[in-house]
Amino acid sequence: MEEQGTGIRVEAMAAEYAQQARVWAERLGLPLQDDTAAFAVQVGADGLQIQQLGPQAPGPVRVDFVEGQAAHRRQFGGGNGQMIAKAVGIAQGIRPQVLDATAGLGKDAFVLASLGCQMTLIERQPLIAALLEDGLARARADEEVGPIVGRMRLLTGNAIERMRAWEGEAPQVIYLDPMFPHRDKSALVKKEMRVFRPLVGDDLDAPALLEAALALASHRVVVKRPRKAPIIDGPKPSHSLEGKSSRYDIYPKKALKA
């Protein structure tokens, strides 16, 4: 038996998805065959998902804006009273244009889009960006969620470089949630982190990310951190909003107006 490596393969969950699997393999530059792979990008009835391989592997990770956690948060998440809404400056008559420069699986961006914000998302890791692209495409077909994801535009690549080379109108608010080595024990976060960490690693460039965001945003920068984590090296935030497990550090530049 071959030892498991660190590679990634693409596989179809059934014969009818073989062509889609070939397309994704070509786009991502990944093989369709690799018996030693540590991860599989799987193509099936539920779209695209990433499955860690091996006996102790958690379940697959995919993006689903229509059902599950996203649907529950959309319906019961607290609307404009949510801390993230206050952090980015949502108020009566104010729905800022927001750039989420560390999009991940798009959960926070989806919450803000569901509250009416026009969102631009940047994701640097090609596999995570592929999950996000697939989730957005499936959500567009849903009658209720389609208009929400219609407010979400996905860009791929290095967020620092993209912000430094930004052309056109600057985003009013830039939202950052750098990958941070924290110990959240919830099953879902644990599963996603176990899959993410080997693929993405920690954002050791967080100070440069903050610097680029502060240079570009017209009104404010918001940084989400684990509640007890230190602030990112660089300018100090003016204030923070603190929740049970996380907090939002606010770096204002000028007031948002209705």
From Swiss-Prot:
It catalyses: guanosine(1516) in 16S rRNA + S-adenosyl-L-methionine = N(2)-methylguanosine(1516) in 16S rRNA + S-adenosyl-L-homocysteine + H(+). Residues 232-258 are annotated as: Disordered. InterPro entries: 16SrRNA_methylTrfase_J (IPR007536), SAM-dependent_MTases_sf (IPR029063). GO terms for cellular component: cytoplasm. SUPFAM superfamilies: S-adenosyl-L-methionine-dependent methyltransferases. S-adenosyl-L-methionine binds at E123, R124, D177. It is an enzyme of class 2 (transferase). The keyword Ribosomal protein does not apply. Its EC number is 2.1.1.242. The keyword rRNA-binding does not apply. Residues 239-252 have a biased composition (Basic and acidic residues). GO terms for molecular function: rRNA (guanine-N2-)-methyltransferase activity. Keywords: Cytoplasm, Methyltransferase, rRNA processing, S-adenosyl-L-methionine, Transferase. It holds the Pfam family SAM_MT. It is found in: Cytoplasm. Specifically methylates the guanosine in position 1516 of 16S rRNA. Belongs to the methyltransferase superfamily. RsmJ family. This is Ribosomal RNA small subunit methyltransferase J. It comes from Pseudomonas putida (strain ATCC 700007 / DSM 6899 / JCM 31910 / BCRC 17059 / LMG 24140 / F1).
